[in-house]
């Protein structure tokens, strides 16, 4: 049986689910950019790409060389193709305007070019997260500057989302709103090949991911839930749990997609004015879309993440996602 490449899969989606051709082309361009980023990441010190730039992004985070390089790769790959009205990135304060010499399209691309980049120098898996939105018709004028408001849509309006993980293998996980597929990069073929079909997150789990060093700063519902997990078989949940924490959202979520679990990045008391650490538009929304399409759940503790109406491009949010039973349990604790 012949292997199904990403291109073939997308063509078949156009035939069977009426996936628009311009969306198919957009996903293929993003995938090509991810292959280029994967190559740069794999070279490491040999490519002179490790270390920091000595600059900060809009989040106040020190930019790694590969952060900036990955951002440029995604911008340059997508700006000319005619599929996009604009782009937004973790690494840029404002939306990226499609240069006037190129045609504009109907979609918006939002991305974290290199999630987990603090792990680059220690050779831990990192990745690229992306979300595709339709550009509202009122912002489609070819001559106008695209405003931030065009991007401020709830996660339910996403038409596609995915992430590439750069680890022992490079994989692309993708949803077009009808389930989640996993593609592995065949370096000899030069293509992403379908290797994981109809991915499903188990409803219950015996694993959880959270940064335990922040325990003293958590809100009461989170403390209660984690204490119950740690109590094991003798505790109220009646089974033993293992903790896993990689400190790379892509790597932690990828593990949950493949074998179940719950990922938690709660708000804490150190910065009470902030609703969380992770960014809604280009981290929480695409990952929540993927997790829900795989049968899991995602909330901020009180509300479904995909229902949140963004107030700004770099809005932060608390995140609890993964196996449905566990996410519903901790959401219930927040409601008490």
From Swiss-Prot:
Could you name the domain of life of the organism this protein comes from?
A: Bacteria
Q: Which reaction does it catalyse?
A: beta-D-fructose 1,6-bisphosphate + H2O = beta-D-fructose 6-phosphate + phosphate
Q: How is the cofactor bound?
A: Binds 2 magnesium ions per subunit.
What InterPro entries does its record include?
A: FBPase_C_dom, FBPase_class-1, FBPase_N, FBPtase
Instruction: Please name the GO terms of the biological process aspect recorded for this protein, alphabetically.
Output: fructose 1,6-bisphosphate metabolic process; fructose 6-phosphate metabolic process; fructose metabolic process; gluconeogenesis; sucrose biosynthetic process
Any one GO cellular component localisation term in the record = cytosol
Q: Which residues bind substrate?
A: 115-118, 211, 277
* MF (Gene Ontology): fructose 1,6-bisphosphate 1-phosphatase activity; magnesium ion binding
Needed cofactors? Mg(2+)
Key word Lipoprotein present in the record? Answer: no
The pathway it acts in is: Carbohydrate biosynthesis; gluconeogenesis
- Assembly, per entry: Homotetramer.
**Name of the molecule in the record:** Fructose-1,6-bisphosphatase class 1
Q: Which organism is it from?
A: Pseudomonas aeruginosa (strain UCBPP-PA14)
